[in-house]
Amino acid sequence: PFPGEKPKIRLLYREIVLGMRQDIVETKQEKLEKLTTAFGTAYPEQCGRTHMTAQAIKCFDALLADGTVVTVAGRVKSLRMMGKIGFAHIEDGSGKMQIFLSEQTTGLDAIKLFADTIEIGDFVEATGKVFLTKKDEKTIDVAAWRVLGKSMRPIPTEHFGLQDEEERLRRRYLDLLSNPETRDIFMKKNRFWQTVRTFLSERGYLEVQTPVLEHIPGGAEAEPFITHHNALDQDFYLRISLEL
């Protein structure tokens, strides 16, 4: 069963978010072929990034004053193409930044290729000088761009995200893509355990790995979870107490 309160919502979720509609897959395949023709490959081995988005935003005033050309790379999170101009937001591991494509700077052919082939979820590299929009948003005026990876399945949009709790747990990768709150929790946990490990390591403590599955259950009165190892034809127990 698919999530949603109404059958129509379930069907829409199945077709769009999970990418199970054949016409969507075929359209993406056509766009992939166009990108391959234009760039030689839609999945290059390297990118020429000079700044993370957070770094470009932090150093914005200096970059603007010097007229420095920067290159950022990341996943397209939003896209607004309007004929001879277009805006998009690129997100990397540090944050998100807006890019601007125009006929004057980017070139009409490059804009048309971007509009015809790039979708939310794709990875791109954008190069240009920074400027401030009329709405005071720090933006890159794109002089050149290229694809770094074509997403062959649609992802949940930035506005709606992935709201269904069951699907968020089942498809954790989509949850991390769509919901910054979930991603923030994972990052905080990672920093916490890194800090604990560093603190103890600097004081001479040794970290050891203990078995996850055991032949003999431990943990005093606690009832262990049991599983069967088919290849060994043996029962194993999930560890309860790490210290035992």
Describe the residue ranges of each PLM region.
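N-terminal amphipathic/basic-hydrophobic helices that include classical n-h-c signal peptides
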Residues: 1-19
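Class II aminoacyl-tRNA synthetase catalytic cores and aaRS-like
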Residues: 13-244
